[in-house]
Amino acid sequence: MQPAAPQTLNLDLVGRTLEAPEFTYDWKTCATYALGIGAGPEELAYLWEGTPGFHVYPGFAVVPVQGIVMDALARIGADFRTLVHGEQTLRLHRPFDRAGVLRSTGRVSAVHDKGKAAVVVIDTTTHDANGQLVAETTWSIFCRGQGGFGGEPGPSPVAVQPLPDAPPAFTAQFATQSTQALLYRLSGDLNPLHVDPALATRVGFEAPILHGLCSYGFAARALVLHLGGGDPARLRSFSARFSGVVYPGTIVDLVARPTDVAGRFAVEARVGDRLVLSHGVAELA
């Protein structure tokens, strides 16, 4: 039997705004996310509701918009069996409150033709109940086998260069737990690839893999702790490319290096010698 032909993408969706249902959350939602990205007892400001000035890690920005991103991909005709999360960006305009109601919109801003694959770029904005802009995110999703439709290839990622010979701003090593993907999925990313051993093996992995956004959240958390003095409001933006797979239970080495722009850092992460986050750029106040 011949495999089914890839579905044609609905390019008419490009530029259209999609509304997400209101997202109601409380401190437990935020603490669950913090645990999913490795927070421990020394970070009670992110975990214990009794802490004065309870904090929320900036990576939480992806949580209220996961549904609208999946909806956009479904409407455009992406084949969910072949999706690969390529890049992620967040821009934080104000810290998340410990509880509240969030209203988000999404928009497919571009579809790039990479030949064998298409890259769907989705932008989201999130406002609080008072209408104040809290966060924006950009998701770049590779749709393997759905390129070749005659579109523009789009830009190629360019790595921000660190200052030559400058010492790192910081290095950090974080040990993911064997249960890390099981914890992270409680924040709403329920892709069975991260929990089902049979599925993971069937698509070519040794075991269920860690969510890319979990590794991204670990990195954003480290930036807040090491460069932001533990203040989430100081991380203004963070973008990174997912360059390799992380398995739960492995150790990840992160490095941030200064650039020629004050407050801007080049970021990458490795498992051993293997790059897993690349083209990282963080901006802090």
Spans of features found by a protein language model:
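HotDog/MaoC-like acyl-thioester-processing domains
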Residues: 2-13, 83-172, 246-249, 253-285
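Short amphipathic
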Residues: 16-26, 166-179
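Short Pro-Gly-centered flexible turn/kink motifs
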Residues: 18, 101-105, 212, 216
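Hydrophobic, proline/glycine-rich low-complexity stretches
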Residues: 1-101, 227
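A conserved acidic, glycine/proline-rich C-terminal tail/linker
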Residues: 223-258
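Conserved beta-strand segments that form the floor/walls of ligand-binding pockets within enzyme
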Residues: 91, 204, 241
